[in-house]
Amino acid sequence: FNGMEDENIAQAIPNAKASEWMEENIPLFECPQRNFEEMYYYRWWSLRKHIKETPVGYGMTEFLVQRSYSDKYNLIACAIGHHIYESRWLRDPKYLDQIIHTWYRGNDGGPMNKMNKFSSWNADAVLARYMVDADKDFMLDMKENLEAEYQRWECTNRLQNGLYWQGDVQDGMEESISGGRKKKYARPTINSYMSVSYTHLRAHE
């Protein structure tokens, strides 16, 4: 994979260390279908490119190039849930521990400024991570932060009928015929996220 590109942007784990890092951190996979194996390892090779060292710990970027709408350290909240789901398989927990802490506590102890710009299923992702590593202490330590995130959505995106609204782009869906950037439509996605978040948070009271 390293030979496919001129590595013009390197972050915490450069191409030169990719093979060693993958061998130490990811679940190794083998199957008779060569191209399937190749896709599997390419995904991990790509994921580690987005692990970034910040002044407050590791973060994970969505784009390697700087984006004008990003938060501190070029982080974008849209993919947090994906990043947690993908990274929960890493053997060394420091990467995902710090990535989560950077989002929720990396802004002078509080959440990143643009964390609520995109829909969130982070409570479900944190629980899914626990299902892999069984680190109950970490999960419960995050509960207060996840509760606060849930309440922020209650304040900003709840309609009078009890449902939640979201715009297309802020829902991570780009543009669609069913929505818009400024319309307050009660989309199935954010309502399912909020329902699952509520269920998970109440289950650990």
Model regions and ranges:
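Conserved, charged catalytic cores of large soluble enzymes
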Residues: 196
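Substrate-binding groove/exosite segments of carbohydrate-active enzymes
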Residues: 7-141
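Proline-centered turn/helix-capping motifs that create local helix->coil transitions or kinks
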Residues: 51-56, 91, 154-167
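Acidic/His metal-coordination segments adjacent to aromatic residues that form catalytic metal sites
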Residues: 65, 103-111, 169-186
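Short, contiguous, pocket-lining structural segments
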Residues: 75, 114, 182-193
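Active-site cavity-forming subdomains of large catalytic enzyme subunits
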Residues: 145-157
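Conserved small/polar residues in nucleotide/adenosyl-binding loops
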Residues: 199-205
